A protein has these predicted regions:
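Phosphate-recognition beta-domain surfaces
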Residues: 1-69, 74-181
């Protein structure tokens, strides 16, 4: 589903190293209604907090992270993409999340890929990686150093490659959560 900027502009706790205001509005237009009027809080930024999956998990377990989040990645070829998750990121032996989860591209074009209902492989976290989607492949996979990732077609979201290439180098990663406005 192609996204266009909606009328809702949330207040961001800090400037994003990845997203423009129009891109934020486009993502907001795809969010569940309960999240659309919320302000965004930057829980983790690789630019601010260093490049470490452990740091991202620690931020995701913080007092402000009780539920939904937006994970955004920018690769070294200036493509931006990410995921909305209905549950917090955590290390788990199995997939978790709900059908509200989706993956998206932001740059070069804003498009959301929603749950296909083919499986329920929404999100999982291990000590050495995190991933969205599954079946034929991961929609999004990031390594423990947050330096490399891969993306491909996933049965969960029926998405194409989200990045500039299936294997990519990461420039920035951000994790945003929602606060009532």
């Amino acid at each position: 589903m192609a996204l266009s900027p909606g009328s809702q502009t949330p207040t961001l706790s800090e400037d994003s190293s990845i997203l423009t205001a129009d891109q934020v509005r486009s993502i907001v237009s795809a969010l569940p209604a309960r999240c659309r009027l919320c302000n965004w809080r930057l829980e983790y930024s690789s630019r601010r907090d260093g490049i470490s999956l452990r740091s991202l998990y620690r931020a995701a377990a913080g007092k402000h992270c009780s539920g939904e989040s937006v994970l955004v990645v920018r690769d070294t070829n200036a493509h931006s993409f990410g995921a909305f998750t209905s549950e917090p990121w955590r290390v788990s032996p199995r997939y978790h999340g709900t059908g509200e989860s989706f993956v998206f591209t932001v740059e070069p074009q804003c498009v959301a890929y929603r749950w296909s209902q083919k499986n329920d492989y929404f999100m999982f976290g291990r000590g050495n990686c995190l991933a969205m989607g599954g079946g034929s492949g991961f929609a999004l996979w990031l390594d423990e150093e947050l330096l490399h990732g891969n993306t491909g077609e996933s049965d969960t979201f029926d998405n194409p490659c989200l990045a500039s290439e299936t294997e990519f180098e990461i420039m920035y990663v951000e994790l945003w959560t929602f606060e009532p406005s």
